[in-house]
């Protein structure tokens, strides 16, 4: 990425990312801001905005959540910061597989370069505990957890660079047809191990 694209920043406009853990939070935030930003000049105007929003799946072009494997193009990166020992950035993302749907969200940068597929269970637990400590002033555990479910950093999207996608990660959803040229193969070469690898 650094050599071919000449990008020195960890994340910049034009980068391709892949969501590596399902996320339900940010689309809900997007829907709420769309509804809250509806003009209040008249009930008819607000109703019209609501109808437009509902026509295409609550204003999200039919996306119900950000799924593991969804690709996004970074439009802008702002407010890179370190909190709780993790690095976060506010980003504007465009999802080409969903009619170029755009979303403003927070991503956790630590997942970009890890060897693991996403943040490890230990990292997730550490982040959870750090966020929980921030809400320690709320005495009732149920209320504290309710507040935490709305925390933007705890719900930051976990992403990886998406310059190369394995067939497994794409889950067949990226292409209508896939053609494999395996070259010249003799019957001896078509072993169960090879077929398993091919799959």
Regions found by a protein language model. Give the residues of each.
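Core RecA-like ATPase module of SF1/SF2 helicases and allied nucleic-acid translocases
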Residues: 1-199
């Amino acid at each position: 990425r650094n050599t071919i694209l000449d990008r020195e920043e960890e994340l910049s406009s034009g980068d391709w990312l892949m969501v590596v853990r399902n996320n339900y939070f940010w689309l809900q935030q997007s829907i709420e801001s769309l509804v809250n930003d509806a003009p209040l000049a008249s009930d008819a105007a607000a109703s019209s905005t609501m109808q437009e929003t509902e026509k295409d799946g609550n204003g999200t072009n039919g996306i119900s959540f950000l799924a593991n494997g969804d690709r996004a193009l970074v439009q802008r990166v702002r407010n890179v910061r370190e909190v709780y020992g993790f690095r976060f950035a506010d980003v504007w993302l465009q999802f080409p597989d969903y009619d170029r749907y755009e979303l403003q969200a927070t991503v956790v940068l630590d997942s970009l370069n890890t060897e693991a597929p996403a943040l490890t269970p230990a990292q997730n637990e550490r982040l959870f505990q750090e966020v929980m400590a921030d809400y320690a002033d709320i005495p009732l555990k149920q209320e504290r957890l309710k507040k935490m479910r709305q925390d933007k950093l705890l719900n930051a999207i976990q992403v990886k660079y998406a310059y190369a996608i394995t067939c497994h990660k794409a889950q067949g959803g990226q292409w209508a047809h896939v053609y494999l040229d395996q070259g010249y193969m003799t019957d001896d070469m078509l072993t169960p191990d090879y077929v398993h690898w091919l799959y």
